[in-house]
Amino acid sequence: MSTNKKTIVWFRRDLRIEDNPALAAAAHEGSVFPVFIWCPEEEGQFYPGRASRWWMKQSLAHLRQSLKALGSELTLIKTHSTVSAILDCVRATGATKVVFNHLYDPVSLVRDHTVKEKLVERGISVQSYNGDLCMSPGRYTVKRANLLLVLILTGKKCLDMSVESVVLPPPWRLMPLSAAETVWACSVEELGLENEAEKPSNALLTRAWSPGWSNADKILNEFIEKQLIDYAKNSKKVVGNSTSLLSPYLHFGEISVRRVFQCARMKQIIWARDKNGEGEESADLFLRGIGLRDYSRIICFNFPFTHEQSLLSHLRFFPWDADVDKFKAWRQGRTGYPLVDAGMRELWATGWMHNRIRVIVSSFAVKFLLLPWKWGMKYFWDTLLDADLECDIIGWQYISGSLPDGHELDRLDNPAIQGAKYDPEGEYIRQWLPELARLPTEWIHHPWDAPLTVLKASGVELGTNYAKPIVVIDTARELLTKAISRTREAQIMIGACGDEM
């Protein structure tokens, strides 16, 4: 410990003590005042959904216990103004410095700029760190014209990065910084992250998930040692242990992406040495996923409007169909397409979906129903346990053809064919659509083609206990083609001659 500075550590989505650059720097320099500030009003339209708030509540309780074991105390504050709360903490503690780790979503970018500005005005030192990415967004010069190049570079960087020990160990001990004046702190319960009506539903989450940074470490080790080797093979399955389940831990910063990268990269090197092709392929695929996460932050950092506008300018003229009844049917899993409906019902029940299913249901909303992609993005934000604004923005823009490297806008994937590919035995369908459980596998992904005798024997009555298709595939393709033509016509009419540079 080189000095005895008084430092406030502002926790946000970095709820861990291991590999936390802001906490490590503050602990090295002197006494520490850890604080988490909850300001619902500032979240605006991106106020976290029920499942996400439940996770945050559990994670904060876990972090509080960990900091207490190190001799410190996490101060929790609920406020109408983050800036005011931080300034109150500075006055109460006599702190001369505030540190935190970067966030890259549109809400945080604006808030962080304001906080830094107000603190500097008052002569308070401010330092922010990269605690969320393998690579800093500032490493790339990003324009709309080179988005694909940036994606390729981030993916390649994650495959080629050295495996040096960049993970910071937890502090052995923290020197607490006491507040001379009263700070209006509260308990985890008083933050209001969970109301009484939500608790019965959240009890189901408790059975399936264990939030907290030390639990994240266990999940990572389990995945790396037992499941990573089959990751590529299992990526085409939507049932069983086919994903890492790390995304909520990464979103809340309970484990650092550098730690995840380091573990996977070490396995990749070992498998390459041993000429284990299956393992190498799996590690490569997983590391490219880490690169995609970095890419989402790089794009949001350079184009903070992406939660509201398409990155490709001509798609701003696409004639989306703002049909609330279709949107409701999609949300409730009543589209008549089993794989889509199973995914949406799983989402509502658990706050979770396999990434492959996320792509399928979002593509259906955008391409089959022509629903505004921003509607789907917002619904994912409201319901996903691991709702991550940067990843969701890029995911929905990708599906809607709004990225240079995204799905072609005219690409229409048949959910029945995808069902046969990713759920060949119909296990996933039967789990989430019990009304179709008795239907033979031959028909389970396209019950509208099944003979009436088969439907009757299986207890299925289309239009009664299971929906008829909300739109016929040929009709959906025709409507999509017309919408694309109208987009091009509108672009020509107003003189939009291509991408903005």
From Swiss-Prot:
Transmembrane regions: none
Photolyase/cryptochrome alpha/beta domain ranges (all copies): 5-134
Stored Gene3D superfamilies: 1.25.40.80, DNA Cyclobutane Dipyrimidine Photolyase, subunit A, domain 3, HUPs
Gene Ontology MF terms: ATP binding; blue light photoreceptor activity; deoxyribodipyrimidine photo-lyase activity; DNA binding; FAD binding
SUPFAM superfamilies: Cryptochrome/photolyase FAD-binding domain, Cryptochrome/photolyase, N-terminal domain
Keywords for the protein's UniProt record, in alphabetical order: ATP-binding, Chromophore, FAD, Flavoprotein, Nucleotide-binding, Photoreceptor protein, Receptor, Sensory transduction
Residue positions binding FAD: Y231, T243, S244, L245, L246, S247, D386, D388
An individual GO BP term: circadian regulation of gene expression
Entry note: cofactor: Binds 1 FAD per subunit.
InterPro entries named among the record's database cross-references: Crypto/Photolyase_FAD-like_sf, Crypto/Photolyase_N_sf, Cryptochr/Photolyase_FAD-bd, Cryptochrome/DNA_photolyase_1, Cryptochrome_pln, DNA_photolyase_1_CS_C, DNA_photolyase_N, Rossmann-like_a/b/a_fold
Binding site for ATP: R356, D405
Stored PROSITE patterns: DNA_PHOTOLYASES_1_1, DNA_PHOTOLYASES_1_2, PHR_CRY_ALPHA_BETA
Cofactors that this protein relies on: FAD; (6R)-5,10-methylene-5,6,7,8-tetrahydrofolate
Record's note on what induces expression: By visible light.
Cellular compartments per GO CC: cytoplasm; nucleus
Function noted in UniProt: Mediates blue light-induced gene expression in addition to its role in blue light-dependent inhibition of stem growth.
NCBIfam families xref list: crypt_chrom_pln
PANTHER family: CRYPTOCHROME, SI:CH1073-390K14.1
Known partners and oligomeric status: Homodimer.
Family: Belongs to the DNA photolyase class-1 family.
The name this protein goes by in its record: Cryptochrome-1
Gene: PHR1
